Amino acid sequence: PNPDLFPPRMIRLSDHIAAAGGWLSLEAFMQLALHHPQEGYYSTAIENIGSRGDFSTTPTLSPILAKAVAARWKEACARCGRRLPLLEIGAGSGALAVKVLEQLGFWNRLNTDYVIVESSPRLREFQHLLLGSQAKIYSTMEKALKHCGGKAFIFSNELVDAFPARVFEYTEEGWREVGLTVKDGAVREELRPVRQQPLFSHMLEYDSQPGQRLEIHDSYARWFTGWLPLWNMGVMTVIDYGDEMERLYYRRPQGSLRGYKSHQVLTGEELYRHPGLTDLTCDVNFTDLLELSRNCLGDTVTLMTQRDYLLPYAENTPQDACLLYTSDAA
């Protein structure tokens, strides 16, 4: 059927605010807008992924990331003394998977499991159509790790920033959590006292200037610690956009929460006008991510820029030069 005849439905935000008791945290709003099973962005609104769609990401621009992933996988296999399955979390259109499989070469493709974890039914359809029998696709990490026997080379690209985040604002009374309420028939932001401290972040222990906002990915921490005990051998690479705390919020009083709709950047109250039809994201605080990772995995966790990760595999092309010298991912 022609999708234009059956456009995605926009979420009735006021109904969900009422169901939550009159105040909905921004984390809950993002969860609803992105992952609602019938009306969320990842369920209905994604049509094109790449240079003309809502996502324009490294795998669609250059094979350099696939080269790096394939090389690091080989290093991990040598270190572990066995052939590890490749496990990609949040594979999007499957573009990176295709390029990684190409980089593996015929023999490795034939003898290595390529496993994808994708929570979005719509994206799983994309991946099945593109990859066919070349990849095993699961909806959860638990199912994927069971398939792998707990041993895998795990990697993700732009995954953490797709998780819902809690948003906080500093006031004269200290930190408050940002949520949504309905006033005079319109959806408005409202600050409330912090009732539950973040799981791993220490961000709220610091004072700031009134009005300063920041985001904390508690939902990622809950998800990560939920499946981690099932993983008993391998290497993990997490690639995302962000910075360490001091630089991330320097001259960014409103934080980094933003939306993308048809390549237009939305901020402020524009974020709440098209729930379910807008891709929502915020930059990753690597100070928090390192704290979480080292708490769970020890001192083996390291942080590097995307440039340093990719540089050994770069070629003299405009695409590679763009990725190496304009990216702040790590």
Walk through the language-model features, giving the residues of each:
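Conserved small/polar residues in nucleotide/adenosyl-binding loops
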Residues: 2, 325-330
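Rossmann-like AdoMet
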Residues: 6-89, 93-151, 168, 308-311, ...
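Short helix/loop capping segments that flank catalytic or ligand/cofactor-binding pockets
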Residues: 42, 163-165, 246-247
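Anionic group-transfer/hydrolysis microenvironments
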Residues: 90, 120, 159, 242, ...
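Conserved acidic residues
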Residues: 151-152, 234
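A mobile, often basic/glycine-rich helix-loop segment
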Residues: 155-198, 253-262
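Long, Lys/Arg- and hydrophobic-enriched amphipathic alpha-helices
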Residues: 199-327
